[in-house]
Design a protein with these regions (language model features):
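Extended, highly charged
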Residues: 1-152
């Protein structure tokens, strides 16, 4: 990825018109799951979503579909959004040999702003957890990016 952190990537998506910020109040369930499933159906060019007003949480934000379209994937690589898919894959392969990279330690990392300490921590009180699909056995904190292809295509 061409960015040092999620914040700078989200800013790049916003600058390219690929981040839809939603400030209306939503419920973690079912609204966030419905939004996640809807973005998958939009098709080519679906934006990333940012929710910052989640019922029951004072300072929680959720972002999803950050690399759920080829435009967003291109932006994540620091390429123009209209970069052809083959060129994106070629660029990804070219960069592969540079990984893994050594972690960079910082005196005051940005994630420290959102740290909770203690012995009695309940994630349901802190995070707007939601199930993505009916029948999910539990709640997911993240979901990986998977670029795949049908072997018969």
């Amino acid at each position: 990825m061409a960015f040092d952190d999620l914040r700078s990537f989200l800013q790049a998506l916003d600058d390219q018109g690929q981040l839809l910020k939603i400030s209306e109040e939503v419920n973690a369930e079912p609204d966030l799951a419905a939004a996640a499933n809807a973005t998958g159906r939009i098709g080519d060019g679906a934006p990333a979503l940012w929710f910052d007003n989640i019922r029951g949480f004072n300072d929680a934000r959720v972002t999803m579909n950050t690399i759920g379209s080829w435009q967003n994937h291109a932006i994540s690589l620091g390429l123009p959004p209209n970069t052809p898919v083959k060129k994106q894959i070629d660029e990804f392969i070219r960069r592969w040999d540079n990984f893994p990279v050594t972690p960079e330690r910082r005196a005051n990392p940005a994630w420290e702003e959102n740290t909770v300490d203690g012995d009695d921590i309940n994630l349901f009180d802190i995070l707007p957890l939601f199930r993505l699909n009916d029948g999910d056995g539990g709640f997911y904190l993240d979901k990986a990016c998977v670029v795949s292809r049908d072997p018969l295509d």
